[in-house]
Amino acid sequence: MKSAKAKTVRKPVIKKGSQTNLKDPVGVYCRVRPLSFPDQECCVEVINSTTLQLHTPEGYRLNRNGDYKETQYSFKRVFGTHTTQKELFDVVANPLVDDLIHGKNGLLFTYGVTGSGKTYTMTGSPGSGGLLPRCLNMIFNSIGSFQAKRYVFKSNDRNSMEIQCEVDALLERQKREALPIPKTPSSKRQADPEFADMINVQEFCKAEEVDEDSVYGVFVSYIEIYNNYIYDLLEEVQFDPIKPKLPQSKTLREDKNHNMYVAGCTEVEVKSTEEAFEVFWRGQKKRRIANTHLNRESSRSHSVFSIKLVQAPLDADGDNVLQEKEQITISQLSLVDLAGSERTNRTKAEGNRLREAGNINQSLMTLRTCMEVLRENQTYGTNKMVPYRDSKLTHLFKNYFDGEGKVRMIVCVNPKAEDYEESLQVMRFAEVTQEVEVARPVDKVICGLTPGRRYRNLPRGGPVGDEPLVPEVILQSFPPLPPCKLLDINDEETLPKLADTLEKRHHLRQLMTEDLNKKCLAFKALLKEFDNSLSNKENYVQEKLNEREKVISGQKLEIERLEKKNKTLEYKIEILEKTTTIYEEDKRNLQQELESQNQKLQRQFSDKRRLEARLQGMVTETSMKWQKECERRVAATQLEMQNKLWVKDEKLKQLKAIVTEPKPEKPERPSRERDREKIIPRSVSPSPLPLSSNNIAQISNGQQLMSQPQLHRRSNSCSSISVASCISEWEQKLSPFSTPVNVTSLARHRQQEPGQSKTCIVSDRRRGMCWTEGREMVPTFSSEIGVEEDHCRRNTPIPVRHRRSRSAGSRWVDHKPASNVQTETVMQPHVPHAITVSVANEKALAKCEKYMLTHQELASDGEIQTKVIKGDVYKTRGGGQSVQFTDIETLKQELPTGSRKRRSSTLAPAQPDGTESEWTDVETRCSVAVEMRAGSQLGPGYQHHAQPKRKKP
């Protein structure tokens, strides 16, 4: 009869104790691979069981002092070249499997350069199984008799497990297998001969203190991270020979407990080591490997084999699984085989191999960055964000580094000299990883049911054996009683035999009683001795306890003293922090004030330099102006005197000819050798002054009349016309216009119309006219042909065949003198591909087609005026370079501080006093406008829209 079913005890609330605050560092182990050839150079040396030395091989660059560098690195354990897989498993993986069975997570990954033995360490080889098959063997050896039936535990898509009853599990088995209920096999399943040698069943390994009142289920999954994409290696995809499908990548998600998992990953329930390793081997065949220059079978992806152990307690009767989802404990052990870091200059990778190597190195670099940030946060107390999401590898195992299990790393090292630089980087990463601490996982919660429920229904006393009990042995030692039937009165044998037997039995009883008394006395003596020793121990313990209490009281006093001292120091620190804050604020204020003073000094210095440049420019401009004015006046005076002398000479010659010769003859051409030899400097125009309207009219009429007569070039064969007649003729033509022109009005006219004034001066000079002191226009008798000859003689000869192509790109010579001042204008000249020089030279001109000179002078308003003089560079006949100036650009900066009042036009007609002026009338002045029609092809026009206002009678 079964006992009544007891109530299930609820899961107690876990109080955060001191255990949750404990942290363990990441366990880093090192394994050295044997050399492929005995005569290879080695750069790694094992010092002891925890120290490894790395020295620079021959042929590498020496240190500054000429010695080879030797560096030692410490690990939790160093495994030499002769270490077996069993020794490595017992030290590294055995504790992780034991924690897995007790409900704790674990992470084990191998790290190293390519060809260092990571895959061998994790998987193994025929006859020498690696860590993975040994972990599976230990798990099934520990929970083999406590496993639940298949499909009792069922996984869902949310990284959790569900419990099914026996009936649902049976239906699920029949549905999936489509077979009747299978019988328990009489013998174990035979392993695949391809990997049978890797599973060594002779080496029995089992975890201790396995919970016998729980049932277990094992689920395995196998994924790979290839080019930062996650692929399921256990996914069954139907092969289509016509249109094969590429494997679909999986995504990472977060469950309700903030644990990361691969969504849609296949989880296979296994019941034995052979079955689990067969699933692993099926996925291993799909893993991406390739042949490289350094490794014949190089892993091109990171592989993750996860073992998920699900355990649930039995009910109060010990017959079935407890149907409560909250009581399920899920623990996971992830075995990660990282792809090796490699250098492309050694592997000679190209194409896809190069892309794979880049992604592998990038993910490993992200792992290293995460470790460095974790170490920095734990060492300095910072709160920097750990970049887990930069790589799928680190994002998947984020929970392990945040305190969800133990983390172990095996650093595989190849001791050959060619891998020295890569091994050095691996050692540095291992050094950083050892300093990272991970929170210790919490122990599994006890369900609260009575232990030993599994064996409660078995017969009391356990199984009966063949050995007799102690009371039966004692009874069998007595002699048996003889038969007591008396068949005859004279029977004398039965009674004596019975008496003899009873005497023997009585003797044995006395012996046993004596023995019992002796044993009782001995037991009493032992009990007294035990009591005495116990009292002595109690006294000793009491003495020790008193001593400890005294020590504790002393330590409490010391703690109180230290706490008071700590409070005092904290108060001092707080005061110092406040003082430091005040000093820092004063320092910032002083720095800001210093910066403002520096800026002010810089502005004053720049203003001073600008003022000096302005004054220097004004002085230079004034001196040049007066120098040019003096030269102009001297040249004008010389020219006037020469003209007067020439006129007098001509008159004297004519008079002499008239007096000496009776007949009029052809006058000889005067000698011009003196005038040709003497070069008359070009006079500078006088300062511009406005002209009055009357003077402008006179000058314009005079220019029209002056332009009418055309002087022809004289030759020796011309008619005999006297010079005096020519002079008189010109004087008669100029007599109506000989009114002197006001200098002030002429200057004003030139200021208003500088372009016209320049044109007049040039045209007058070409016609042979010059301005005298009386501002009279005197014609000279230089011919047009002479002017052309003089012009051709003064210009630089330029060959026509050296004309530059207009389609070719031009290059400039940017001539900026060293005395120029840097302006702060927004608009700055920008010439690409220009050669900037401070002094023009032939080398720079030979390379360019354009020339520009930046000239600065002081304007009338006191500001700096920058002129950019542009020109074309040509080759001369002599092999040199010449510049023909073509354009001038003026850059000027002014302040908009002028008067808002419009200045009246100087061309407004003067009105007599007392009359109203139409020029000042608003209606009259606004009746004229410049207008341009929308859509018109013509330019702006001068339009008149309104009638001027009538005058009052």
From Swiss-Prot:
Function: Component of the centralspindlin complex that serves as a microtubule-dependent and Rho-mediated signaling required for the myosin contractile ring formation during the cell cycle cytokinesis. Essential for cytokinesis in Rho-mediated signaling. Required for the localization of ECT2 to the central spindle. Plus-end-directed motor enzyme that moves antiparallel microtubules in vitro.
Domain of life: Eukaryota
Region (Disordered) location: 658-695, 894-921, 934-953
UniProt keyword list: ATP-binding, Cell cycle, Cell division, Coiled coil, Cytoplasm, Cytoskeleton, Isopeptide bond, Microtubule, Mitosis, Motor protein, Nucleotide-binding, Nucleus, Phosphoprotein, Ubl conjugation
Coiled coil feature spans: 542-618
Site of covalent link Glycyl lysine isopeptide (Lys-Gly) (interchain with G-Cter in SUMO2): 572, 587, 625, 648, 663, 666, 816, 847, 867, 870, 892, 949
Binding site for ATP: 112-119
InterPro entries given in the database record: Kif23_Arf-bd, Kif23_Arf-bd_sf, Kinesin-like_fam, Kinesin_motor_CS, Kinesin_motor_dom, Kinesin_motor_dom_sf, P-loop_NTPase
Phosphoserine found at: 155, 160, 606, 683, 685, 807, 860, 904
Signal peptide positions (record): none
Motif Nuclear localization signal: where in chain: 7-11
Subcellular location per the Swiss-Prot or TrEMBL entry: Nucleus; Cytoplasm, Cytoskeleton, Spindle; Midbody, Midbody ring
Basic and acidic residues composition bias: residue spans: 662-680
List of residues that carry Phosphothreonine: 739, 920
Gene Ontology molecular functions: ATP binding; microtubule binding; microtubule motor activity
Low complexity bias spans: 681-693
Name this polypeptide is given: Kinesin-like protein KIF23
UniProt tissue specificity: Detected in testis and ovary from newborn mice (at protein level). Detected in brain, spinal cord and small intestine.
